[in-house]
Amino acid sequence: MELVFIRHGFSEWNAKNLFTGWRDVNLTERGIEEAKSAGQKLKAAGYEFDIAFTSVLTRAIKTCNIVLEESNQLWIPQVKNWRLNERHYGALQGLDKKATAEQYGDEQVHIWRRSYDISPPDLDAADPNSAHNDRRYAHLPKDVIPNAENLKITLERVLPFWEDQIAPALLSGKRVLVTAHGNSLRALAKHIIGISDAEIMDFEIPTGQPLVLKLDDKLNFVEKFYL
């Protein structure tokens, strides 16, 4: 069986080189074109889906919609869930990456960005931009909403959704598309492929490129490739 991952198209804050995380920003024109191209590639390669999973952030939802529209599959069920959100970058969200490196030093920012188990500083829950003040998360217990995450915590957040939703869909024979974010997809890939803590730091997923994971009938990893 095959599972298709797509990282959302290039966003407004990708273009501005800002830390994004759970902040909700839109796609750029480049990002829209990337999503269209992804949908066209999937259509040309004959990929059909029974269900699509995405996050509750606009850039991933729009990418999912565009991909499905371009491949004439906009009608299939879509499941939006916060567990597929990008890694939460804490107090770094909204900051310029270059300016942050100048303030704290390249080494410290590199640790915050690339360490598997070290998180950036927390975002104050009372901050107007905190997810605690966003009604899309109002149904969640306050202690579940993160104030900052590393990749290890992101994996712990994403894994229950894999086990409860994505894996059962695959095992039931459904053809699955997951349109999400660089780090939530990296976390899933780490689990599925069996990438080590050290190796995952160099594992990147480009924006808007369909990544196909081939799995056996027990969801063991076989191979991966980009369309």
Swiss-Prot record:
SMART domains: PGAM
Gene3D superfamilies: Phosphoglycerate mutase-like
Chain's gene name: gpmA
Classification of source organism: Bacteria, Pseudomonadati, Pseudomonadota, Gammaproteobacteria, Pasteurellales
InterPro entries: His_Pase_superF_clade-1 (IPR013078), His_PPase_superfam (IPR029033), Phosphogly_mut1 (IPR005952)
Site residues by UniProt (Transition state stabilizer): H181
Catalysed reactions listed for this entry: (2R)-2-phosphoglycerate = (2R)-3-phosphoglycerate
Protein name in UniProt: 2,3-bisphosphoglycerate-dependent phosphoglycerate mutase
Species annotation: Actinobacillus pleuropneumoniae serotype 5b (strain L20)
Binding partners and assembly: Homodimer.
